[in-house]
């Protein structure tokens, strides 16, 4: 078990232990290295008109109130195409047999049958903004601001609110600190939001994932 220099065991280690032991404490709202986070066994993508529900973060890229990244909910396609189609984007998704995976595709159809899918900007070994169309005017997404991340590690889903970071810093954070297996960065700036038991930031946002 890892510990801090003062002997304390941090939230990262404690939440990892809880996941491995099968603890019944999810969804769990914790701060990991100072960043608000929701850890859960599963997610349900939603696109509602009311205030942000409990245990939710703001979602992926949208335009005029509608999602413009790949989005599948309950096996039904909400948005079929990538944000910068025909350029592909990274998509975190759950298969019908319960596996969580990631792929870089241009359409939801390329994933086959899935329970849910959330497109975004690929992180970790998939971090390549130019390959996913985030160049020119669209590179504004990479600026230093608040961002949200959807990630996966050890059977758990992570919804993370990253405060005042560039996309490169977000990528380094989820790689070096959270040590996620898969992750996509979602929309940021004025739309970044989290609503959890303790963490409540910008909860009036309307496009999000629970």
Language model: regions and residue ranges:
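Short, well-ordered strand-loop elements centered on a beta-strand within folded domains, enriched
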Residues: 1, 34-39, 97-106, 155-162, ...
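Short beta-strand scaffold segments in enzyme catalytic cores
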Residues: 1-2, 26-31, 38, 90-94, ...
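Zymogen propeptides
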Residues: 1-85, 101, 159-160
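Active-site-adjacent helix-turn-beta-strand microarchitecture at beta-sheet edges
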Residues: 3-4, 60-137
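Polar/charged alpha-helical tracts
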Residues: 15-20, 31, 49-51, 74-76, ...
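Short, flexible beta-strand-to-coil junctions
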Residues: 42-44, 61, 94-97, 153-155, ...
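A broad, low-specificity signal marking well-ordered, structured residues that form hydrophobic/aromatic
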Residues: 54-55, 90, 100, 121, ...
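Conserved, well-ordered active-site substructure
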Residues: 65-86, 135-210
